[in-house]
């Protein structure tokens, strides 16, 4: 059966900005997960409890998420 040539079924490719944005979001999610594990371990190891523990873990999650997200965004930008 011949294949139709029309534009039906073809999807537009994402723009370079969309790819960089997606790379940042994926990297941020992975960095947050890693930050939750490492932050919890390091905060419990030094004896943090309660509100101090939540603040320390949250700070570590945001830092690692932002760092890894930035590197993933740069990597996706290079691939554009």
From Swiss-Prot:
It comes from the Eukaryota. GO terms for cellular component: mitochondrion; TIM23 mitochondrial import inner membrane translocase complex. The chain crosses the membrane at residues 22-44. One of its GO terms (biological process) is protein insertion into mitochondrial inner membrane. The keyword Methyltransferase does not apply. It is found in: Mitochondrion inner membrane. InterPro entries: Romo1/Mgr2. It is a single-pass membrane protein. Residues 42-60 are annotated as: Sufficient for antibacterial activity. The keyword Acetylation does not apply. Keywords: Antibiotic, Antimicrobial, Membrane, Mitochondrion, Mitochondrion inner membrane, Transmembrane, Transmembrane helix. It holds the Pfam family Romo1. Belongs to the MGR2 family. PANTHER family: REACTIVE OXYGEN SPECIES MODULATOR 1 (PTHR28525:SF1). Has antibacterial activity against a variety of bacteria including S.aureus, P.aeruginosa and M.tuberculosis. Acts by inducing bacterial membrane breakage. Induces production of reactive oxygen species (ROS) which are necessary for cell proliferation. May play a role in inducing oxidative DNA damage and replicative senescence. May play a role in the coordination of mitochondrial morphology and cell proliferation. This is Reactive oxygen species modulator 1. It comes from Danio rerio.
């Amino acid at each position: 059966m011949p294949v139709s040539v029309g534009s039906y079924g073809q999807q537009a490719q994402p723009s370079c900005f969309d790819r960089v944005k997606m790379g940042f979001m994926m990297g941020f999610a992975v960095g947050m997960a890693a930050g939750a594990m490492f932050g919890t371990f390091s905060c419990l190891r030094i004896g943090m409890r309660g509100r101090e523990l939540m603040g320390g873990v949250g700070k570590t999650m945001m830092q690692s998420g932002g760092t890894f997200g930035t590197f993933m965004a740069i990597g996706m930008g290079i691939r554009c």
